[in-house]
Structures are given as structure tokens and as C-alpha cells.
Regions:
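N-terminal mature ectodomain segment of secretory-pathway/periplasmic proteins
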Residues: 25, 29-118, 146-147
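Zn-dependent metallo-beta-lactamase
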Residues: 230-299, 397
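Gly/Pro-enriched, hydrophobic low-complexity segments
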Residues: 152-247, 421-426, 433-434, 439-457
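Conserved beta-strand hairpin/beta-sheet module of binuclear metal-dependent hydrolase folds
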Residues: 275-321, 420-438
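Core dinuclear metal-dependent hydrolase active-site scaffold
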Residues: 273-279, 395-432
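Active-site metal-binding motif and surrounding structural segment of the metallo-beta-lactamase
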Residues: 301, 312-357, 458-464
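Flexible, processing/modification-adjacent segments and terminal tails
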Residues: 21-26, 99-179, 188-196, 248-266, ...
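Divalent-metal (often Zn2+) His-rich catalytic cores of metallo-beta-lactamase-fold enzymes
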Residues: 348, 452-487
Length: 487
């Protein structure tokens, strides 16, 4: 028996060695097919998205994981330096004005991956954009003991960076090499607070020699199954002579750049302040810049209006709820809309067993996101997995048990999201809303202008307090709302 075991171990070792040797040949052949370049630059047009920021597209009311339609990027140019290693991409695009404006203004797309960020021992969120490229992937495969397997007509190279996920699990990067030694697809995963083990896939098609460099004609990247980035390549050049100049970081400019790595160090402790709004009714805040929550006590349960974000704030709020209302479960948590700054605390409430109340256009995205495995994460929901539960709001939903009433209304059309709802508490005449903040002394922004006729003329809500999820410097009232609207 011992002899058979030793033989099995020996065969496994031989297979592993053979796989590694085979991988080296596959890598060498693929690098040769791509021109054995030290650097490459390619250009054309591109598109990106505001990720996890469902917009207000009239053609498709269902909120996707991204802002639809995608944002165009003209004069897109990307340099990949395999020696440094480093990458830089730039382009001309547009931005939506700040502060609730819908005005489109010119902007700049800029994505920089430095040699330090591209180090495989550094946070994967900051380096993966380099290693998702065919050239970067092959470099990583050559330097990190890739293995090779056959799958679906491709040779699949697989390797792992040295950096580990929050859970301690290794990240895995796989690249699909076709029979012409071209990279068709590169995929990996990243732990995302809302989307769990988020699958990141980059596909490469239409490979051709652009008269100076082999490059794909089309690049498409998805995250969590949702559109994320696209490039149509019209020119490419291998080993450009001015690599150092092109790779220099751009001057600071406006615009939405590429994804960066997570912050470091422990977050400061959050001090929760409780304001009593009525019997069995409280507002929780952590001060300026907070994402506030309203806690509603019903006869047999608690309803939490907005979960707070990030998870640390949601955790602090849940602890405060248990002090305020001991022995009653948080049965519901209302989500005003599915933007990333309003969903960050939801995993904490899912772990608590709360049902998420959200507009029906948001359910498909949030259900898929929150029920994805979380093996790369180290949060409570990852340690104690629970299935996210939902109650969908169509145009209106009322929660009442004879002691307390909360009314939820879908507000549309508004420019911010197809899945926006507001919460109305009739007894105390409170309107609680996300992203419709008014600034005292200033006219209403485009979001507030859209909300005004819905709340005042269509729904005819009788409210005195106008409370935003985004904590302001001073309390807001209906009078402030009317003044901003010029009524």
C-alpha cells in the first residue's frame, strides 16, 4: 500500500512538472505570436461605465449593474510597458456635472498603473488591469509558475499572484489560448463588498497585424456579468521608441479614471449619534459626510430605512438599533436605490436576516450581486452565508401594523436612477430621501427639480421635515425644498 502511495505521489509530481513545462512552451509560443514585444501601444475608441451606478435609461427601466448607456471615450490610447512593468491609458470623454446637475461637460479619461501597483504582491484591485491584457497575462504566467490544461478547444494557462484575498484564499488568473497561439480571453475574480466573488472577464477578438504590432480589433471587459469597458482598436505599434515619455503619469485632470486599489490601515471608529424623531422613531448619523438611517419601531419588529455604508457604519447602526429596541428583529431594510454608495451596508443587514425593500427595477441586480459566493471576502456574510431576501416595490408599498406606518413611493422619471424610491412617515410628516439634497440659499439642482412635481403635485405628500440620507450641515424642511424650487 505504501509503495502504491509513493508511486501515486511520484506520478502526481511528474504530471505537475509536465504541466509546468507544457505551460512554458504555450507561453513562449503565445509571446512569439504576439511579436515578443517589450512594449506596445494601441489606440482607437473606447467606452466605459459608472459601475454599480444604475442610471435612468428610458429604453430599459431595469437597473443594470452599470450606468446605461456606456460613456464614449475618443482618441483612446493605451501603452503597456512589460519591462517596467507599467501601463497608461488616456482619452477624451465627457462628465456629468457635480451636485445633482445633468449638464454634460468635456472630461479626460486617465488610467495609470505604476510599476509598484503592477507588482503581484500588491493589492489585486490595483494591478489586475495590467494582467488582464494579453501581454501582461503572459508576463504574469511566465513569472508565476503557470500550469496548462485543455478546455473547450483552448489551452488554458492558470496562475496566481502572490497577494492573497481578504479571506486568505489565492486569486486565480486564467487565460485561454487558441490554436493560433492568440489570447481569446483572460478571467479572474475580485472580492467586492456588494457583488461578492466578482467575476472579471476580458475578451479579445479580431487579432491582426496593424502594420507595426499585433493587437485585437475588439476588447470587451465585463464585471459580475455586467458591461464594464470596451475598446475598438484601429492602430497598434510594437516597441514604440518613446516608451518612457508615454508612460509618464499625466498631469492631474478631471474625469473618471480606472479602478484603483483599496485603502490601507484601519478605518477610524464611527461614533453614532441618535436623534429621537418621535415615539419609536430615531435618526442615526455619524456626523458630516455620514449616510444616515432612520429606525422605525413596529409592534413586533424594526424597519431600518437605509443600511448606511460602508459595512462599518451599517454594523455600528445595527448595534445601536439593538440598544434602542432590544428583543425585536430588524425585519426590513429599505434601500432607496442601487447605487454603490447606498448598497454598501446591505451585506450586514442580509447577515442579520433582514428583507431588503427596494424598487422592482433593482431586484435583478441586487439579487444576483448579494447572493454570489463571498469566498474572497472576510466579512460577516462571508463567514455566515445567508440568502438575500427581497420585497419589491412597484409604485407604492405601505408597511403598517396599527401602531406605525411607513409608505414607500417610486419616484420617476428622475435623471438619477430608474429604481429610486422615497420613504414617507405620515405621523411625523417626514420625507426621507437619497440624493435629492437641497442646499440652503441655492436653487434646486436637476435631481431636486425632477422630484418636486412628483412629491408636491402627483403624490401630494404632506411633510414638514425633508431628511436626506446624505447628512447635511443643517436640518432641512419642506420650506427649504419649496424655496429651492422657487415655489
Amino acid at each position: 500500500m505504501r509503495k502504491l502511495a509513493l508511486i501515486a505521489i511520484g506520478l502526481a509530481a511528474l504530471c505537475g512538472t509536465a504541466a509546468a513545462q507544457d505551460a512554458k512552451a504555450v507561453i513562449a509560443n503565445a509571446q512569439k505570436a504576439l511579436g515578443d514585444v517589450k512594449s506596445i501601444t494601441y489606440s482607437g475608441s473606447a467606452k466605459d461605465v459608472a459601475f454599480q451606478q444604475c442610471g435612468a435609461n428610458k429604453a430599459n427601466m431595469v437597473c443594470l449593474g452599470t450606468h446605461d448607456p456606456m460613456r464614449p471615450i475618443d482618441n483612446y490610447v493605451r501603452l503597456i510597458d512589460l519591462t517596467a512593468p507599467a501601463s497608461r491609458a488616456t482619452g477624451a470623454t465627457n462628465n456629468i456635472g457635480p451636485g445633482g446637475s445633468t449638464t454634460i461637460t468635456p472630461g479626460t479619461f486617465s488610467q495609470q498603473i505604476t510599476a509598484q501597483q503592477a507588482d503581484v504582491s500588491q493589492p489585486w484591485a490595483g494591478s489586475l488591469e495590467f494582467y488582464l491584457t494579453p501581454w501582461g497575462f503572459l508576463k504574469g504566467a511566465a513569472e508565476n509558475n503557470a500550469t496548462a490544461t485543455k478546455r473547450s478547444g483552448h489551452t488554458v494557462l492558470t496562475w496566481s499572484p502572490s497577494v492573497k484575498a481578504a479571506s486568505g484564499k489565492s486569486y486565480v488568473v486564467s487565460g485561454y489560448v487558441d490554436d493560433k497561439n492568440m489570447i481569446d480571453r483572460v478571467e479572474t475574480q475580485l472580492g467586492d463588498n456588494v457583488m461578492g466573488d466578482m467575476q472579471i472577464v476580458a475578451t479579445y477578438s479580431g487579432w491582426k497585424d496593424f502594420g507595426g504590432g499585433m493587437a485585437p480589433s475588439k476588447i470587451v471587459q465585463t464585471r459580475g456579468g455586467w458591461p464594464f469597458f470596451e475598446v475598438t482598436v484601429t492602430a497598434a505599434k510594437a516597441n514604440p521608441p518613446d516608451v518612457a515619455t508615454i508612460a509618464m503619469p499625466p498631469a492631474p485632470a478631471g474625469g473618471r479614471g480606472g479602478p484603483g486599489g483599496p485603502g490601507r490601515g484601519p478605518a477610524p471608529a464611527l461614533m453614532v449619534t441618535t436623534e429621537k424623531l418621535g415615539d419609536g422613531l430615531w435618526k442615526l448619523t455619524t456626523g458630516a459626510g455620514s449616510y444616515d438611517s432612520i429606525i422605525v419601531e413596529f409592534k413586533d419588529y424594526v424597519m431600518m430605512l437605509e443600511a448606511g455604508q460602508p459595512q462599518a457604519r451599517a454594523t455600528a447602526y445595527v448595534a445601536e438599533v439593538k440598544k434602542l429596541v432590544p428583543n425585536k428583529p430588524i425585519r426590513y431594510v429599505w434601500n432607496s436605490h442601487p447605487h454603490s454608495d447606498h448598497t454598501g451596508g446591505l451585506p450586514v443587514l442580509v447577515e442579520e436576516g433582514a428583507t431588503i425593500v427596494t424598487q422592482k427595477n433593482n431586484v435583478a441586480f441586487l439579487e444576483k450581486a448579494l447572493n454570489t459566493p463571498r469566498t474572497l471576502l472576510d466579512d460577516p456574510l462571508a463567514k455566515t452565508p445567508k440568502k438575500a431576501k427581497f420585497e419589491a416595490v412597484d409604485e407604492k408599498k405601505v408597511y403598517s401594523d396599527g401602531t406605525r406606518t411607513v409608505e414607500i413611493y417610486h419616484v420617476a422619471p428622475v435623471p438619477h436612477s430608474n429604481g429610486l424610491t422615497i420613504a414617507y412617515i405620515p405621523k411625523e410628516k417626514i420625507l426621507f430621501q437619497g440624493d435629492f439634497t437641497v442646499t440652503p440659499g441655492e436653487p434646486a439642482n436637476d435631481h431636486v427639480k425632477a422630484l418636486g412635481p412628483i412629491v408636491l403635485d402627483k403624490l401630494k405628500l404632506d411633510f414638514d421635515k425633508y431628511i436626506p440620507v446624505h447628512a447635511g450641515n443643517a436640518p432641512q424642511t419642506k420650506a427649504d425644498f419649496l424655496k429651492a424650487l422657487g415655489r
